[in-house]
Curated annotation (Swiss-Prot):
Protein name as catalogued: Isoleucine--tRNA ligase
One Pfam entry name: tRNA-synt_1
Record-linked SUPFAM superfamilies: Anticodon-binding domain of a subclass of class I aminoacyl-tRNA synthetases (SSF47323), Nucleotidylyl transferase (SSF52374), ValRS/IleRS/LeuRS editing domain (SSF50677)
Entry's family note: Belongs to the class-I aminoacyl-tRNA synthetase family. IleS type 1 subfamily.
Binding site for ATP: 598
Gene that produces this protein: ileS
């Protein structure tokens, strides 16, 4: 008989390698076929609700690592909530309207301007639906559990109808109006943009100082004096109608080179240096209020401008005097309106000057090309004091990446002025993670202007507005509901297939249309109004969902996006915020802090990672990330996640193998009968569960991951399971010490598997298949209960103290290894000269300390430590090579090898175990 045959070597079919790219897909197919999502919800019927509302990603292109971070985070939360006593449905959504779809069709050669609008929109719909299906497959492959058969999509007729009703309610309350004012205008998209659709990039721009001569100085300034302005947009000078000064500032009239100029006193030294004025003198100082309603002459055209007062003028840069073009700036517009100035915006949708511009040379010219022309004309007129160039951050269209301008156009707006305070009060009631999110959103709402909700595009939800014969806009509760019902049945394309009269309620009349003729609005709603209405189209409308949602979770850019638009529409209509909690996450960057881009070659595709490593590795990366700030990802970082995964998997495999002969119903040892170290591990396990569940409840997966991984690495692998081999392999199969340890290991397996299922559902489902538990799937089990024990504080204190003794012994062993006294720790004879405190502790523990320290021999001495002892906090320690021979069965070096004549090759312990449990060994003899 071989010595090996007398050992309890664990067996399991749970493989060392996960083969995740293959096995995950098989698990997902099985879950879908067995309707696990539906099963889980059925189990939870009647339990408290938890509604996480999915912010809809845009349906365009393959998913990226940012999508993975977002969707996996949501999946972890929903899985945890469902396993922890909540009814937690998850309806995934998609945002499908807007410019990106139109851009994709343009790339395919589809021209929206020459095509029937309804047919064009049908092509858009088909493309968007294809993208939804592609992304859905990708999200499923990440292991996300959701109601995939019933997603919400912003192009769905029912959703569009609810969005129309939200608009109608806001209109009825007086929050929607039509006006002409400067808005972000994308000449590349030929449409307005909301603030959330603008991003900033560095560009090189000209900056000029221009002199505007005084025309009527009201007896205070002479006509030989000029106002000096500074601007980075020379192309707006032809549209100048005013100059603004700050009424609280002082202004200096300076004489230089025989000419007089007005400059803000706080800016004088900086401007003089920039203009190279070495010899100038201040001839007069005026208050900003002195300038009010003076006039000046435009340096290029026969146009008289007015000087205005407003505190938006700062002394941070420029001259303290601001050139105003009311059609090309928000502040310009606001101050101009107070002074009764016209809104002058001589530019078309493509950024080209129209014939209204007072300069024939500029008509038809692109605004950016006009910079040089205008500067040259100013120089010829003697009005250009300086031209230079600088690089600065400038707004760009987030889709086309082209610069945008402010341009006054007639648009539909939503104003929050009437209910701003109500929104702010709702923000105060909500919980934000991180906490700074509350301040950020509060300040955005406090300071935000009106929301331009109209767009000059084709693919979107039409603005449900009719115009009478005298151009009066018609929006009534009856027209809104009639259009909503049509959209609900046929979709919003009905707006383009029916006449205005067919879309209006039967017999509809208006005093503004004596002939009964009406026309339809051609603009569509901003896509942020689409997604911002999802609380109505999904959470309020669908059975099984609740309003307000318990949680909105998106990237931190959504404070100005979805968090913002949803809040405005919801408070406008219901008086309540659509969410109780908001969780924001950072952006995914590479390991050097750069954005992912093809040009940098740092793009990591989730689909590529899944093919190479598996979705579990991405899920572990998500769980291990601190998402309160930007999250780094690279091949190296993913390899680290893969290493962590291997550690987890191999630890689970070891525990499965060593409980394969354990039946929890027959073999379990009760807690009071366990050894002290087994009790210690039970207590540590339950403390872990308590802390991890608390972290899950705070959506702090990073802490869950760290705590679980630390427990696996430090408490299990590096400690408990390390010395466990001497019991699991060597002791008799049915010995109480072995069964006690197996009881703990099995408990660890069951509870860790449940605890880690939200993060690693595929792997934990695989582990579950080897356990003897009643649920067919771990996803149908609940989070582990936390067990408490009467003696847990005492046991923890004692064994935590012992771990310090162990740490000192490990240091002494390491030193002895380096000195070549021993090879492996198991060859050592350790003599401890403990402190009184340590001696009392070791006596109290009454444990097999030698076995736990994994050494061959241990002596605890009351004598004084010799000079060569390693003096450490808990004991002085001497490490020597153990005397005797190595037992081939337990590998311990001991002097009692051969003490039992029946088994001369074994130590006394092993001989006794073999004799009792393998009687045939004595007859056959043992072979190594």
């Amino acid at each position: 008989m071989r010595v090996k045959d007398t050992l309890n070597l664990g067996k399991t079919k749970f493989k060392m390698r996960g083969n995740l790219p293959v096995r995950e897909a098989e698990w997902q197919k099985e879950w879908e076929e067995n309707k696990l999502y539906e099963q889980r919800l059925k189990l939870n019927e009647g339990k408290p609700r938890f509604d996480l509302h999915d912010g809809p990603p845009f349906a365009n292109g393959n998913i990226h690592m940012g999508h993975s971070l977002n969707k996996i985070s949501k999946d972890i939360i929903v899985r945890f909530k469902n396993m922890n006593g909540y009814y937690a449905p998850y309806v995934p959504g998609w945002d499908t309207h807007g410019l990106p779809v139109e851009q994709q069709l343009a790339k395919k050669g589809v021209d929206r301007k020459t095509m029937d609008r309804a047919k064009y929109r049908e092509l858009c719909r088909q493309f968007a639906e294809e993208q939804v299906q592609k992304q859905m497959a990708d999200f499923k492959r990440l292991g996300v559990m959701a109601d995939w058969d019933h997603p919400y999509i912003t192009l769905q007729p029912k959703f569009e109808a609810e969005e129309i009703r939200v608009f109608g309610e806001m209109f009825k309350k007086g929050y929607i109006y039509k006006g002409k004012k400067p808005v972000y205008w994308s000449w590349s998209s030929e449409s307005t943009l909301a603030e959330a659709e603008v991003e900033y990039h560095d560009i090189k721009s000209p900056r000029i100082y221009v002199a505007f001569p005084i025309k009527d100085g009201k007896g205070i300034l002479d006509s030989d004096t000029s106002l000096v302005i500074w601007t980075t947009t020379p192309w707006t000078i032809p549209s100048n109608v005013g100059i603004t000064v700050n009424p609280k500032f002082d202004y200096s009239v300076v004489e230089v080179n025989g000419k007089k100029y007005v400059i803000g006193s706080q800016r004088l030294s900086a401007v003089a240096e920039d203009l190279g004025w070495e010899d100038y003198k201040v001839v007069k100082t005026l208050k900003g209020t002195d300038f009010d309603r003076m006039t000046y002459q435009h340096p290029l055209y026969d146009v008289t401008g007015v000087i205005m007062n407003d505190t938006y003028v700062t002394a941070d840069d420029g001259t303290g005097l601001v050139h105003n073009a009311t059609g090309f700036g928000e502040d310009d517009y606001n101050v101009g309106r107070r002074y009764g100035l016209p809104v002058f915006s001589p530019m078309d949708a493509q950024g080209r000057f129209t014939k209204e511009v007072p300069d024939p040379d500029l008509v038809g010219m692109f605004y950016d090309d006009a910079n040089k022309v205008v500067a040259d004309k100013l120089e010829k007129a003697g009005a250009l004091l300086k031209l230079s160039f600088f690089t600065h951050s400038y707004p760009h269209d987030w889709r086309t990446k082209k610069p945008v301008i402010y341009r006054a156009t007639t648009q539909w707006f939503a104003s929050i002025d009437k209910f701003r305070d109500q929104i702010l009060a709702e923000i105060e009631k909500a919980n934000f993670i991180p906490a700074w999110g509350k301040t950020r959103l509060y300040n955005m709402i406090k300071d935000r202007g009106d929301w331009v909700i109209s767009r000059q595009r084709a693919w979107g939800v039409p603005l449900p507005i009719f115009y009478a014969e005298d151009d009066t806009p018609i929006v009534t509760p009856e027209t809104i509901e009639h259009v909503a019902q049509i959209f609900e049945k046929e979709g919003s394309n009905a707006w383009y297939t029916y006449t205005a009269e067919e879309l209006l309620p039967e017999g509809f009349k208006s005093e503004h249309s004596p002939n009964g003729k009406f026309r339809k609005e051609t603009d569509i709603l901003d896509v942020w109004f689409d997604s911002g209405s999802s609380w109505a189209g999904v959470m309020q409308e669908r059975d099984g969902l609740g309003f307000p949602a318990d949680l909105y979770l998106e990237g931190s850019d959504q404070y100005r996006g979805w968090f913002n638009s949803s809040l405005i529409t919801s408070v406008a209509v219901t008086g309540k915020a659509p969410y109780k909690q908001v969780l924001s996450q950072g952006f995914v960057l590479d390991d050097k802090g750069h954005k992912m881009s093809k040009s940098l070659g740092n793009v990591i595709s989730p689909n590529d990672v899944i093919k190479q490593m598996g979705a579990e590795i991405i899920r572990l990366w998500v769980a291990g990330a601190d998402t309160t700030s930007d999250v780094a990802v690279s091949q190296d970082i993913l390899r680290q996640s893969a290493e962590s995964y291997r550690k987890i998997r191999n630890t689970m495999r070891f525990m499965l193998a060593n409980t394969s002969d354990f039946d929890p119903k027959e073999d379990a040892i009760a807690y009071p009968d366990m050894s002290g170290v087994d009790q210690y591990m039970e207590i540590k396990l339950n403390r872990l569960i308590e802390e991890a569940i608390e972290a899950y409840n705070k959506f702090d997966f990073n802490s869950v991951y760290k705590k679980v991984f630390s427990f696996i690495s430090n408490d299990l692998s590096a400690f408990y399971l390390d010395f466990a081999k001497d019991i699991l392999y060597i002791d008799a199969e049915d010995s109480e010490t072995r069964r006690s340890m197996q009881t703990v290991i099995y408990d660890v397996l069951v509870k860790l598997t449940k605890l880690m299922t939200p993060i690693l559902p595929h792997t934990m489902e695989e582990v579950w298949g080897y356990l003897k538990e009643p649920e067919d799937y771990v996803q149908l089990a609940n989070m582990p209960e936390v067990d408490h024990f009467a003696n847990e504080d005492e046991v923890l204190a004692d064994w935590n103290a012992f771990m310090k003794v162990r740490s000192d012994v490990l240091k002494a062993l390491e030193k002895a290894r380096n000195a070549k006294v021993i090879g492996k720790s198991f060859e050592a004879h350790v003599t401890l000269y403990p402190t009184e405190e340590t001696k009392a502790l070791l006596d109290k523990l009454n444990a097999n300390i030698r076995q736990i320290l994994i050494v061959s021999d241990l002596t605890i001495s009351d004598e004084e430590a010799p000079e060569n002892a390693e003096k450490l906090p808990t004991a002085s320690i001497v490490v020597e090579h153990a005397a005797g021979e190595v037992c081939p069965r337990c590998r311990r070096t001991t002097t009692d090898v051969g003490s039992d004549p029946r088994f001369p090759e074994l130590c006394a312990r092993c001989a006794a175990i073999v004799a009792e449990n393998f009687p045939e060994a004595e007859k056959e003899g043992l072979e190594k």
